[in-house]
């Protein structure tokens, strides 16, 4: 047994072969089941052939098991003799295999036919019923004998051929009549007359071939020509298509029409291949233009009418030949409502409200007989008989086509009668203007259900055509005229600036845009619609040139003159953009030449008067001088202009425009100068604020400024200049330079009753000065930056030389070996050192005030004052300055003096260490982290051991302090 899933997938198995059933399996099983009936075998063959034809082949699945086969000759011999068969139903003559399905049947008597055979099994029915049953049997088993799909396709093809034959020879699927079935039935009845009248192509296809008169290349004599005009038409159309589309399309058509005998001329062996090649070459050489298509009515009239004049008279009179083919075209009346999408679209396009559009439609189309906007429809169409007043329904109205125009079916007969009466009466026939139909006309011919149709038809109004103007300039050829017309259309839409763009883009192609071109007048005529536009523009151009020449003689610019000459064309002035700086507050110049109002002039004058008080005297004098020169020049021009009365008004406008421009330029110059001055003043004020803040900080710390010490020696030129600048700075108050400090506060360690003057001589070597300068050199950078006036470009007052010579210098000597020089005035660097030293002395004095009673504190204060005075000197490169200093010295005992010296030595050692640490820190900022670590280790080692320089300084002080 097979597995269950395999049996289900296969749909059953026979001998290990599984069969997948298809759609027709049911029918096949029915046939095989009824195999006992006569003719069942043949029916089975027919059904199998139909199944193979209709359905795809069945999918077969072969499935089996592997088994071993053993050779057993004895068993095979028994099988051949049929020893394995058993009798069926006890009949020894009929033996079956044990696997035979007939073994399941026990009794055959109910299933056997009677001894005489079956008679008519429908004998119990009446004759009509038996006839109906036979028809049902035929329909029931029709699929066994006939293919329904092929039969249905054959019927559809026959129906299409019948429709083509009855529709007048055209290939339209829908006829021009709503009652197409009745027309088809009538045409079937009289097919001979219908085909003769409605199928002219059939007659044309049978016409013999005549060489077309438009073919200017005659074919050779030995070339085989087509037999009929139909073959020629196919060849001609194919040749024209291939000539326009290319040779690739010929290959495609040849592949698609390989089985069509009408396209045998495309193959190499076709007998019409040379004629096709000849037509193709003539079309490519432009020697075979297409023939104009003549309407059918003209052909019929040419055949029947003896002369062309009679035919023209018939067409002009509107008469129709009774034998002429009439084609009826249905039209349905429609009138748009207010909420119609078409009406809303028209209102948006025209830019008018909906009510105006509806009124315009009603006024232009009162009887639905004529349409506005140039759209055409049949002239007398859609009378009220096509409209049903009960439910708003409408019926089609037929129009007759006589070859060139559409007319109403009933009115055509009436018009024929009227034409006959007119001819007999003597009135000349009037030509009726008819328009072509379009989709818009059909849309306007529909009538809405909400409104009733008007029955009265007003006669159409003849439009009066304006006479065409006479062109005095040359008209270009058709190709160039088309380009000029298109360019003029774009220029009208986009403006004359588009003309400038085209002129700069391509001069050769658009040469007609140049005024010197011969077709420029035609171009202007297309743009403006005026024939004399070119002459008018030429006159304007000449007037502008004359004005420019006059202005150049007077020494004026032509910008204002051109604007004055073209006063009527102010809209053509060029657009100018003024690019100015952010700080400049000057107004933009006017693009169009116009007079400035009184408010603007008053505001400008007020602004000028407001700006002037803050300006320096020299700048004000320069501005006044420029203004006087401008006024003198304009006055001279005014005299010259008044002397010439011929061109007074344009030159007056030019003069006024130039005056306004000059005033604005002067105002711009004043504002720029004022802006520069204001920026300098801002920088000055900022420096003042910084200096005042620094002074307030010094005053807040409790510094008391004393009177200056009188100078005892001659000042060098630098000191004298510094003093002069300080005095001038105090007088002007515009800027603060530097503040020299020569006094460091009162002596807190003075003892009452022990004051006595003491003269000392203090001497120092050059090494001490360098050390002191190096100590305080880096700490004074910030203050020097604050008091640096190198960026100040304005000096309020010049430096005055000293009036009186200073007294001779005096040197104060004391019991010490050092020499001390004190200067009343110094440069900016010395003053900064004074300030720094003053801060250090104040900090030290606060620490020492706690021990005022000890004599060592008094000695240390004296040492600090000496050190601060030494720091106030200039660097070693500058020459030394001498000054006079008077102070009170106190006598001390030798024991107290030694203590104070030892303390001062220890303090100086600590101070030198701290200064060296700070200096190394500054140097290590610009180094790498590894270098910084190495520098820190060196500084720690230096803190432990004093430097060699400090040892030398201690030795010198020890020797000087020893008695």
Curated annotation (Swiss-Prot):
It comes from the Eukaryota. GO terms for biological process: mRNA 5'-splice site recognition. One of its GO terms (molecular function) is RNA binding. Residues 364-375, 637-651, 787-796 have a biased composition (Polar residues). Residues 290-322, 360-430, 445-470, 593-613, 634-662, 716-963 are annotated as: Disordered. Residues 300-317, 407-418, 458-468, 652-662, 934-944 have a biased composition (Basic and acidic residues). Its main location: nucleus. This is Protein suppressor of white apricot. It comes from Drosophila melanogaster. The gene is su(w[a]).
């Amino acid at each position: 047994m097979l597995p269950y899933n395999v049996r289900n997938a296969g749909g059953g198995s026979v001998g290990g072969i599984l069969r997948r059933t298809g759609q027709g399996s049911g029918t096949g099983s029915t046939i095989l089941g009824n195999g006992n009936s006569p003719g069942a075998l043949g029916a089975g063959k027919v059904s199998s052939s139909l199944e193979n034809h209709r359905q795809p082949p069945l999918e077969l699945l072969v499935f089996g098991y592997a088994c071993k086969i053993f050779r057993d000759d004895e068993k095979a011999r028994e099988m051949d003799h049929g020893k394995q068969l058993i009798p069926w139903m006890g009949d020894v003559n009929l033996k079956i295999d044990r696997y035979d399905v007939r073994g399941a049947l026990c009794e055959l008597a109910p299933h056997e036919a009677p001894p005489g055979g079956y008679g008519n099994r429908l004998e119990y029915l009446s004759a009509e019923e038996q006839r109906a049953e036979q028809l049902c049997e035929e329909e029931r088993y029709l699929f066994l004998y006939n293919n329904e799909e092929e039969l249905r396709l054959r019927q559809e093809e026959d129906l299409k051929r019948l429709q083509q034959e009855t529709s007048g020879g055209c290939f339209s699927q829908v006829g021009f009549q709503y009652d197409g079935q009745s027309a088809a039935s009538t045409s079937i009845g009289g097919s001979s007359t219908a085909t003769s009248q409605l199928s002219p192509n059939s007659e044309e296809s049978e016409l013999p071939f005549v060489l077309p008169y438009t073919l200017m290349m005659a074919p050779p004599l030995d070339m085989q020509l087509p037999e009929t005009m139909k073959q020629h038409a196919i060849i001609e159309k194919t040749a024209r298509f291939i000539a326009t589309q290319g040779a690739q399309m010929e290959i495609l058509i040849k592949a698609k029409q390989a089985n069509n005998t009408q396209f045998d001329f495309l193959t190499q062996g076709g007998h019409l291949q040379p004629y096709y090649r000849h037509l193709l070459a003539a079309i490519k050489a432009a020697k075979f233009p297409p023939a104009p298509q003549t309407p059918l009515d003209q052909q019929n009239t040419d055949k029947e009418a003896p002369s062309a004049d009679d035919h023209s008279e018939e067409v002009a009179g509107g008469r129709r030949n009774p034998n002429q083919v009439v084609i009826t075209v249905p039209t349905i009346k429609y009138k748009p409502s207010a909420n119609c999408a078409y009406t809303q679209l028209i209102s948006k396009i025209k830019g008018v409200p909906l009510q105006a559009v509806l009124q315009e439609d009603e006024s232009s189309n009162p009887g639905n007989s004529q349409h506005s906007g140039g759209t055409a429809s049949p002239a007398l169409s859609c009378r009220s008989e096509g409209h049903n007043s009960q439910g708003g329904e409408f019926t089609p109205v037929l129009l007759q086509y006589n070859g060139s125009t559409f007319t109403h079916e009933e009115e055509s007969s009436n018009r024929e009668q009227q034409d006959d009466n007119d001819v007999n009466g003597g009135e000349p026939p009037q030509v009726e203007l008819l328009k072509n139909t379009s989709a818009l006309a059909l849309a306007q011919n529909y009538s809405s259900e909400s409104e009733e149709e008007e029955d009265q038809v007003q006669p159409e109004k003849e439009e009066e055509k304006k006479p065409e103007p006479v062109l005095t300039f040359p008209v270009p050829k058709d190709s160039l005229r088309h380009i000029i017309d298109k360019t003029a259309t774009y220029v009208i839409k986009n403006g004359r600036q588009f003309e400038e763009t085209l002129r700069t883009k391509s001069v050769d192609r658009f040469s007609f845009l140049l005024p010197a071109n011969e077709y420029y007048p035609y171009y202007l005529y297309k743009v403006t619609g005026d024939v004399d536009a070119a002459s008018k523009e030429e006159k304007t151009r000449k007037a502008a040139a004359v004005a420019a020449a006059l202005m150049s003689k007077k020494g004026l610019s032509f910008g204002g003159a051109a604007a004055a000459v073209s006063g009527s064309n102010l809209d053509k002035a060029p657009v100018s953009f003024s690019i100015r700086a952010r700080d400049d507050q000057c107004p933009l110049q006017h693009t169009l030449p116009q007079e400035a109002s009184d408010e603007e002039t008053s505001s400008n004058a007020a602004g000028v008067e407001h700006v002037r008080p803050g300006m320096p005297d020299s700048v004000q004098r320069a501005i006044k001088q420029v203004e006087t020169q401008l006024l003198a020049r304009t006055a001279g021009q005014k005299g010259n202009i008044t002397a010439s009365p011929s061109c007074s008004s344009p030159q007056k406008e030019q003069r006024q425009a130039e005056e306004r421009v000059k005033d604005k330029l002067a105002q711009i110059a004043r504002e720029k100068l004022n802006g520069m001055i204001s920026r300098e003043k801002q920088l000055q004020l900022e420096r003042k604020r910084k200096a005042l803040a620094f002074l307030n900080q010094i005053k807040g710390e409790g510094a008391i400024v004393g009177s200056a010490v009188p100078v005892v020696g001659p000042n060098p030129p630098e000191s004298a200049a510094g003093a002069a600048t300080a005095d001038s700075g105090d007088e002007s108050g515009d800027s603060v330079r530097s503040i020299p400090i020569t006094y460091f506060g009162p002596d807190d360690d003075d003892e009452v009753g022990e004051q006595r003057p003491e003269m000392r001589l203090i001497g120092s070597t050059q090494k001490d000065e360098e050390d002191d300068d190096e100590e305080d050199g880096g700490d004074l950078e910030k203050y020097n930056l604050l008091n640096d006036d190198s960026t100040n470009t304005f000096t309020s007052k010049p430096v005055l030389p000293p009036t009186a010579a200073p007294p001779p210098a005096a040197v104060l000597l004391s019991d010490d070996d050092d020499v001390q020089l004190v200067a009343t005035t110094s440069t900016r660097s010395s003053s900064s050192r004074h300030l720094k030293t003053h801060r250090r002395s104040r900090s030290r004095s606060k620490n020492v005030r706690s021990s005022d009673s000890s004599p060592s504190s008094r000695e240390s204060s004296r040492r600090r004052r000496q050190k601060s005075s030494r720091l106030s000197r200039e660097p070693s490169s500058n020459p030394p300055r001498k000054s006079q200093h008077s102070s009170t010295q106190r006598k001390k005992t030798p024991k107290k003096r030694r203590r104070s010296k030892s303390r001062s030595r220890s303090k100086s050692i600590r101070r030198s260490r701290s200064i060296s640490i700070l200096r190394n820190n500054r140097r290590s900022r610009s180094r790498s982290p590894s270098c910084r670590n190495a520098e820190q280790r060196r500084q720690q080692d230096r803190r432990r051991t004093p430097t060699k320089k400090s040892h030398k300084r201690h030795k010198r002080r020890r020797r000087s302090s020893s008695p």
